[in-house]
Amino acid sequence: MRVSVLSIGDELLCGEVVDTNASHIAGRLFQAGGRVERHLTVPDDAEAIVRALTELGARSEAVIVTGGLGPTPDDLTAEAAARAAGTELELSTEALTHLERFAQRITGELHPANRRQALLPSGCRLIPNPLGTALGFVVRIGCADCFFMPGVPFEMERMLEETVLPELRNRFPAGWQRVTLKLFGIAEAAIAELLEGAIPEGSRVQLAYCVKFPEIHLILRASATDAPALQQAAGELRRRLGAYLFAEDREEMDDRLALLLRESGLTLALAESCTGGMIAARITAVAGSSAYFLEGNVTYSNEAKTRMLQVPPPLIAEHGAVSAEVARAMAVGAREAAGSDLALSVTGIAGPDGGTLEKPVGTVYLALADQGSCRVERFNFQGDRDRVRCITCFTALNWLQSYLLTRKTTPGRG
């Protein structure tokens, strides 16, 4: 079934708003067994909307449209839909009743401007909207049933689930299945080389690469009838990818790390400098983290490192705050202060200033202290301040996960 998506709004084309609606629609259609063949974005211009609807209506069997159903003068979608369908706008008493009831719950009376939301193409079918003022509607344009919904994401998502998808699902073939493998610490070119020949030529399993910095996602897709081949391919990729694979599908690094920490029975403390609490935020984002996470210190200044972590001032003076020696002292100090089994520290130069020839912007030291040792490693990351901080946070989580996995699989340490 040929399905298209039409997004309407000046704000989408000016870069003011990211079109999350189109992504959500495509994902839900895929899960239901459909696939978006074409996606257009047009401004709040009646002529542009009519042209887009006419074009998509001639080439599709279903068109899902979002945006332009509000009460303001630039909301022109209903008018354009009527023109493209060869009909007129008329006052929908059902839509007007919905507007009046909605207004009574919120403000007590309907604003005159909202009445124009009840002007809909003659003969259209209505799509209920329990969360907002704008009802959706369905009209036939060319060869396609066109489903119109408001651009407000939470309203659109509810209408998609309750009305649009149930109607379309019966017209789709067998559903698609997907496996997402999430990788870190390896480049796309290296992945391609590692996976060469993993999926036999002629296989009906599709493989796509998706970069979501600092992660790389490998997305395997196949129809429901090819589920065994999909699982076989996923198993082969897991075997080849090894430690680069940190999570799958909806699982995040945080979730996998939380599971390992719970299984280990170890407690953790943090000492962060350049990441400013980002690592602690990721760890505590998982419910139940209080079972293993004791405390986090953001010791941004040298004085804080000394006061909170007992890092000796002469050590900082001799080696600098961004150094292996100070990272080690931070981790050891954090572990002693918290009374934890483990302590992870980070100190670095996120930029844009502060770099030197010896320690350029992007220089980061991580340290992990346990009962018997303290491991320290230097990293040199590229990018602006946000990217350096982001990849530092992710590297720290991955580093800790690797430690826990090694401990789990080493006899006598698990």
Swiss-Prot record:
Top-level taxonomic group: Bacteria
InterPro entries: CinA, CinA-like_C, CinA_C, CinA_KH, Competence-induced_CinA, MoaB/Mog-like_dom_sf, MoaB/Mog_dom
SUPFAM superfamilies reported for this sequence: CinA-like, Molybdenum cofactor biosynthesis proteins
Pfam families per the UniProt record, alphabetical: CinA (PF02464), CinA_KH (PF18146), MoCF_biosynth (PF00994)
Alphabetical list of HAMAP family matching this protein: CinA_B (MF_00226_B)
Family: Belongs to the CinA family.
Name of the featured protein: CinA-like protein
Source organism per UniProt: Geobacter sp. (strain M21)
